[in-house]
Amino acid sequence: QGVVADIDGNYTLNVNDGTYTITVRYIGYKDILLNSIKVKAETLLNFEMESDAQALGEVSVVAKKNLEGERALQMERQKATLAIENLGAKEMSIKGISNVEEGVKKITGISIASAGQLIVRGLGDRYSTTTLNGLPIASPNPDNKLIPLDIFPASTVQNITVSKVYDASAFADYSGAHIDISTKENVGSDFLSINFNAGGKFNTLGKDFYRMDRDGSLFKTPSLDQKLIDMSLTDFEEYARHNRLFNTSFQVSKKTALPEFGGNIGFGKRFTLGGNEVSVLGSIGVSNDLQTMDNASIRTLEATGNTLNEFNYDSYSNELKIAALGNLGYSFRTSDHIGYTFFYARNAIDTYMRREGVDYEDHHLIGSNNVTHIYSLQNHQVNGKHYFGKQWDLNWSGSYSKTSSDEPDRRQVMFIREDDQIKLFKLNRQETMRYFGSLNEDEWVGDLTASYRFGDNNKLQAGFTYKDKNRDYMGTRFYYNLNKLNPTITDIYDTDSFLNMENVENGSITIDRKKQPKDSYTAGNSIYAGYIATEYYPVAPLLVNLGVRYEISKQWVDYYTDGGKAERSELNKNDLFPSLNMKYY
């Protein structure tokens, strides 16, 4: 039985007559323990408590910053040794930004070209670099150095940080901008979120939408039967005469554009395991996008200004985006943390185009073609942060990325308009064709960094980084010889009446496979790097960041010449990269 005294120390305890043990406690005072106290009616007991002279030598408060908000990111900019700009998830949500590409556009000095290439101070795509949680990620597009930034939806992003200056801790392959995408982690309370949206574009919703025959949905990546690639040319020609080679035709159907749909499910949970903290976060989102473009035009010019060809076209694009994020964190011994992050993204774009115009020889041509691009990224990361007292800390991280770019079953049929009649265009066999191409890239990265703090705000940092990248590409073409085929054509969308298996079997159509050695290559790149850098205040308001990086780089590519001769090209370099950045507060 017990009672709490009021602010003046008065108390009343109702007990029966008898002998009791009484304990008195108060914060900041020594406990009082009285044994064998005899209590009768209206007994008065007063206690004089002595102050507890013990004092806390140090109080440590451990917390994790939530780097999604503007205020936290502003503090990061102020403390940063480099000139950086950043954009957090909360600001992206307020501004209605749906992916990283749209977010980067909001940062001063950066623009995105029509082809999706990043432009920084007039410098193109190959002058910049992209990292995910500080580790490099490869591009699935061989034409671009940077991965398409619209592959990262805002729902999986904690913040975007852009640095336009060089730092010795980063790979020395950029002079434009370093874009780091930080994925979300659970640093707050438990949550479960479900979002759903629907919409449409004024020039698309409810309008006619054309689509060439497709093998399944955009959730699936169509593939070519491997035996069609491996068999000899003689065996292929015989096989093609009597067997259906592809799961699709050149037939075009017309539908009505439906509303676009999207949704995201996310959850976060924090709990203790063996007295240590564990955090879990997961998120998956799916969205689709429909886009039509009517009466557009394209013209190709020579350097002299002469027109090579000019076409008007209508295009119909269907895009599917999938992104998934998983994060697992484990904190122990107060100042140590290890984590695992998984990120998956898939962008599939299917575009049908009908174009009509004239070529260099004044042929009046009509083209019906379909292109499907499927980009995917799978990234696994592990990381650890360890603090040893107030001066030393050790950070390590590693990642494995697998990116792919597939162009399955690109198809084209060309027609010519002559004397108000539409005929098959047979100037060369490339006018009616199919193409299958795939590019796969695997990348391993490891990083180890140790830091030593001295003085009030000075720091010395040293690290080692390793990167190994391998890329494989292969393309196969199938050309349709239509010289024996002369159908009556009234509708270019209806091709099943003449581009069919019956005409292949009777010899009116011949399908040729072109799989030349020059249509494939294998490449690789290995980098070993070490660096040392310091952040030093010579005087209070002046911060000097001085560093040097040494890289051993080996690059190679195995390819074939037009004549089919195997070649290897190598580039081995040892480079020294100094850096100096100063900041005056």
Regions found by a protein language model. Give the residues of each.
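Short loop/turn motifs that connect adjacent beta-strands in outer-membrane beta-barrel proteins
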Residues: 186-191, 272-279, 334-335, 389-393, ...
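Flexible glycine-rich, low-complexity coil/linker segments exposed to the extracellular/periplasmic environment
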Residues: 204-256, 423-430, 474, 479, ...
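Outer-membrane beta-barrel pore proteins
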Residues: 51-52, 93, 106-111, 123, ...
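Transmembrane beta-barrel wall of Gram-negative outer-membrane proteins
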Residues: 246-353, 375-382, 388-389, 580
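Periplasmic N-terminal accessory/gating domains of Gram-negative outer-membrane beta-barrel systems
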Residues: 10, 38, 66-67, 71-120, ...
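Outer-membrane beta-barrel translocator domains and adjoining extracellular loop/strand segments
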Residues: 205-209, 292-299, 351-358, 407-415, ...
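Periplasm-facing N-terminal accessory domains of Gram-negative outer-membrane beta-barrel systems
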Residues: 1-62
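Structural signature of Gram-negative outer-membrane beta-barrels, strongest in the C-terminal barrel
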Residues: 331, 343-346, 372-383, 389-391, ...
